[in-house]
Amino acid sequence: MQISSNISGCPLLTFDTLPSTNTYLKEHADELPDRTVVTADLQSCGKGRIGNTWLATRDMLPVSMLIKAPDNAHDLTVICAVAVCRAIERLSGIKAGIKWTNDIICSERKVCGILCESTLKSSCNGAIYNNVICGMGLNVNQDADFFEKSGLVNAASLYTLTGNKYDKMLAAEYIVDELTRLIDEDFSTVINEYSQRCVTLGKTVKLVQNNTETTAFAKAIAPDGCLICENEDGEFTVNSGLV
């Protein structure tokens, strides 16, 4: 383990290999300061939403941040998505969009997934609060063969999209820099940028909720980040599920 003083002003822990950067922060949250960042050169058991797993490769960047008792816990997936988009554009110049809720899309390919997990904690005075771990997995330097052999036909890396290799720690620095800036920004500004970047809007989409599939038109993003849809029965709001 290497301990660095900070990354964009946040405490940083770097590892050669970890099962999961999110899991490490959950297990060690009590002994780590707020906004501690963890990265690993290789994440062997990474995970995404609804239990999806990540394929292990040193060409992917896993980066997670611990946020202790945030006031805006429900906003953090939206904030992370915008932060990653900004970081990708700073690093590579590629325009980045968001597939609701948490997939980052470049050139119609997924390049990053986001998983924000909360854990309930008790303070010394008995108060209950949430810690949130914001985890991001960015495809940085994988080649086309990796995605072909893995059967990931809708995924790409910054390398496959540009032909350039990138410094993973520089990518992490940009992500953390944008994330720390956006956490403290007015959320209405963030949600406006999220809406502008959302590639789901204006399309007919399939919604999968509780093992039930429906079709609807993705109309707008609500002020809280939910997806506003419309079908023959009228307008409705989706707060979770697959799109």
Regions found by a protein language model. Give the residues of each.
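Long, positively charged amphipathic alpha-helical accessory segments at protein N-termini or as interdomain linkers
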Residues: P70-D71, V78-A96, C106-V243
